UniProtKB/Swiss-Prot annotation:
The lineage of its organism: Archaea, Methanobacteriati, Methanobacteriota, Methanomada group, Methanococci. This is Small ribosomal subunit protein uS14. Keywords: Metal-binding, Ribonucleoprotein, Ribosomal protein, RNA-binding, rRNA-binding, Zinc. It comes from the Archaea. GO terms for cellular component: cytosolic small ribosomal subunit. It comes from Methanocaldococcus jannaschii (strain ATCC 43067 / DSM 2661 / JAL-1 / JCM 10045 / NBRC 100440).
Amino acid sequence: MAKKPWKKKYGYGIRPCQRCGHVGPGLIRKYGLNLCRQCFREIAHKLGFKKLD
């Protein structure tokens, strides 16, 4: 009888990026974005974020 795969309930691998599906560290969850940092950099300006100098 084969073992059932263990499903993570918490930690890095639980939530994927909403845009590309990347799983792991680098996920931005603030304000309910749920985007990886690469996707956030690509669309941050469209979302209304401004880069400060």
